[in-house]
């Protein structure tokens, strides 16, 4: 089976029409990603979060995570899935950052705490020249790695916009990657892939599109981003306008409880103010999505969770 890289990227771009990577993967894609081209070096770091974004990626279907790791990216560092740990793992991470200086993707999962000099999130330890242990904060890690990266991808809403760790009442000074970049005057390409958690297709598709641009910028321009730094490829659709219950809304047929049929707008659905292709792409291998049995809580938006609270409304 033969498939060129150009054809592969076109297939990935079919996400606009609701066809995701998980629906179009076949053996030819492996050939396209490996024939005559290097895999994208990736360093994945974790700050304040629940690891849900990593879990979502690990649940990718067609391609499965095995194929993503073996054929699409070169995952050099990931605290959850890598075999090494402790000082050895961090040492490897810094070695990779130097080896691929200016040519690796930095994926950031979780918010960055800045209060108390960032000590609310210690990501590991290193040894100095005298053999003394040095605790590395998430703040320090991003300061060290981001300027050396080719581009940074903020994976998940906590990383992209602050999310739950930065919600009202937090004492850790949690910040999004973009706010941290602004404070530290870090000028690197930043792409936000929000979601609580993001869909696997959004993460893999963004990396594929970005890496294809690196390999051939003439043929593959960077995906267009919206004002909030999100790829319109995945975040250009309004949930409400693509909802299967839209006709119920237009006819004022509103559900009174979650067990009753009808539009759930009066139960707190945030679909009208939320932009993502969830209605087309769906979740869990295309089986279902949030509005199937609950409501959209607007998890991909910059004002989540405070601006989307309460999630449910009793009418």
Swiss-Prot record:
GO biological process: anaerobic respiration
Record key words, sorted: 4Fe-4S, Iron, Iron-sulfur, Metal-binding, Oxidoreductase, Periplasm, Signal
SUPFAM superfamilies hit by this protein: HydA/Nqo6-like
The keyword Metal-binding is assigned to this record: yes
GO cellular component, one term: periplasmic space
Domain of life (superkingdom): Bacteria
Cofactor note (record): Binds 3 [4Fe-4S] clusters. Cluster 1 is referred to as proximal, cluster 2 as distal, cluster 3 as medial.
UniProt signal peptide: 1-32
Enzyme Commission number, as recorded: 1.12.99.6
UniProt-annotated binding residues for [4Fe-4S] cluster 1: 50, 53, 158, 196
Catalytic activity: H2 + A = AH2
Keyword Iron-sulfur annotated: yes
Post-translational modification: Predicted to be exported by the Tat system. The position of the signal peptide cleavage has been experimentally proven.
Subcellular location: Periplasm
Top EC class for this record: oxidoreductase
Cofactor annotation: [4Fe-4S] cluster
Binding site for [4Fe-4S] cluster 3: 278, 290, 296, 299
Residue positions binding [4Fe-4S] cluster 2: 240, 243, 263, 269
InterPro entries reported for this sequence: Cytochrome-c3_hydrogenase_C, NADH_UbQ_OxRdtase-like_20kDa, NiFe-Hase_small_C_sf, NiFe/NiFeSe_hyd_small_subunit, NiFe_Hase_small_N_sf, NiFe_hydrogenase_ssu, TAT_signal, TAT_signal_bac_arc
Major subcellular location class: periplasm
Spans traversing the lipid bilayer: none
Assembly behavior: Heterodimer of a large and a small subunit.
PANTHER family registered for this protein in UniProt: HYDROGENASE SMALL SUBUNIT (PTHR30013:SF5), NIFE / NIFESE HYDROGENASE SMALL SUBUNIT FAMILY MEMBER (PTHR30013)
Similarity comment text for this entry: Belongs to the [NiFe]/[NiFeSe] hydrogenase small subunit family.
Annotated protein name in UniProt: Periplasmic [NiFeSe] hydrogenase small subunit
Native source species: Desulfomicrobium baculatum
């Amino acid at each position: 089976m033969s498939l060129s890289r150009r054809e592969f990227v076109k297939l990935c771009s079919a996400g606009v029409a609701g066809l995701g990577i998980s629906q179009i993967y076949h053996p030819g894609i492996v050939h396209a990603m490996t024939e005559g081209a290097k895999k994208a070096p990736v360093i994945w770091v974790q700050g304040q979060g629940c690891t849900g974004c990593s879990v979502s990626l690990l649940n990718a279907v067609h391609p499965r995570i095995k194929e993503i790791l073996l054929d699409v990216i070169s995952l050099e560092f990931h605290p959850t899935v890598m075999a090494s740990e402790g000082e050895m793992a961090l040492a490897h991470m810094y070695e990779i950052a130097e080896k691929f200086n200016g040519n690796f993707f930095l994926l950031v999962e979780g918010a960055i705490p800045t209060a108390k000099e960032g000590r609310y999130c210690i990501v590991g330890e290193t040894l100095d020249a005298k053999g003394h242990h040095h605790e590395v904060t998430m703040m320090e890690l991003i300061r060290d790695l981001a300027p050396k990266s080719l581009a940074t991808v903020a994976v998940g809403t906590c990383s992209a916009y602050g999310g739950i760790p930065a919600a009202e009442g937090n004492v850790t000074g949690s910040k999004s990657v973009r706010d941290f970049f602004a404070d530290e005057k870090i000028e690197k390409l930043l792409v936000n892939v929000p979601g609580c958690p993001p869909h696997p297709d959004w993460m893999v598709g963004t990396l594929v599109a970005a890496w294809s641009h690196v390999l051939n910028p003439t043929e593959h321009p960077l995906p267009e981003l919206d004002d909030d730094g999100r790829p319109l490829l995945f975040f250009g659709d309004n949930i409400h306008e693509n909802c299967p219950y839209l006709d119920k809304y237009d006819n004022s047929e509103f559900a009174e409880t979650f067990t009753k049929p009808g539009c759930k707008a009066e139960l707190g659905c945030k679909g009208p103010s939320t932009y993502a292709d969830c209605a087309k792409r769906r979740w869990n291998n295309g089986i279902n999505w949030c509005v199937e049995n609950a409501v959209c809580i607007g998890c991909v938006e910059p004002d989540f969770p405070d601006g989307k609270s309460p999630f449910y409304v009793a009418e």
